[in-house]
Every structure is written in structure tokens, then in C-alpha cells.
Amino acid sequence: MKKGNPKKLDTSDMCGAKIAVQTGTVQEEEANTIAKGCEADNKAEVMSYKRQAEAATAVATGKADAFYADSPVAGYAISQTDGQLEALGDVEGVAKQGIAVKKGNTQLAEAVQKAVQKLMDDGTYMKILKHWGVESGALDKAEINPTDLD
């Protein structure tokens, strides 16, 4: 949303708001669910865009009141707006991110895991995440095929 929350938005009641989302995302589905739960005279308007950058731009230019996206995507968009946008509410449902390597290439997988763990241990990993505004998705341990993906 715009810095300072000029529309006085509240995540517990987005009825009446113009919500920008990227087409085909979970957030688009959730925004449509929110809109369906609003009274007819105070519906949330879901504005779908092909690219997330367009959704963020819609808020920065005043066409939309807020955009809804994954926390790393939202954090990056906010970091790119020179202070025009800010987050509203808490981060929910953080998903783990990964690095894909060819199946069976255990030597490469282990080398990548060790390199990422070194970046975590010396603080470089967090510096990188903070630079891009995506620290909400930070992990504390680099693993190969972790089983606790929630």
C-alpha cells in the first residue's frame, strides 16, 4: 500500500479497497474470495495484472489501494519504490525456497548446500535477503531435500 496508509486499510477488512494482484496466483484467488465476502455496495475490487510489477505500479500511481503478493515479491517491490510503498499486516504462510539441481547430481547438490550454509553462517545470506527486501523468507539452515516444507 502507499506509505503512511492514506486509505486507512486494515487487513481484517479489505472491503471497498482496490486490490492489485498478479493473474494466476494464490493471492488472486484469495482476493476474489475477500471480494465475494463483501456487501454489494462495498465490494473489494480485484485488479488483475499479467506481471507483479504492474500490480505494484498500480498502487504507486494511485490506480489501486494495495497489492497482494508473496512476501519476497512484495518485499522486493517495496524496496524498488524509493519509499512510496510499505507493507500492511503480518507475513503469513512463508514458504521455503530452493535451488534446483539435476536429479542424481549429488556432488553439485552437496557443494551448493555447503556454499549456502557458509553464506548463512557468516551473515552474507541475510545481508543479501535484506538488500532485496525479502528477509521474511529467510531460512536458518541449508538442507538437501528437506522434509519439513511447511
Model region roles, listed by residue range:
Residues 32-37, 58-93:
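A ligand-binding cleft/hinge motif common to bilobed small-molecule-binding domains
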Residues 2-3, 22-25, 51-52, 68-75, ...:
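Beta->alpha turn/N-cap motifs
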Residues 2, 79-117, 135-150:
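Periplasmic-binding protein-like
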Residues 6-9, 46-58, 95:
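Short helix-initiation/N-cap motifs at beta->coil->alpha
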Residues 14, 59-60, 99, 112:
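Hydrophobic residues within well-ordered alpha-helices
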Residues 26-46, 87, 117-150:
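Ligand-binding clefts/hinges and TM-proximal coupling segments of bilobed small-molecule sensing domains
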Residues 2-19:
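Flexible hinge/capping segments at coil-to-helix
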Residues 13-15, 70, 104-118, 124-128:
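Short amphipathic alpha-helical coupling segments at ligand-binding clamshell hinges
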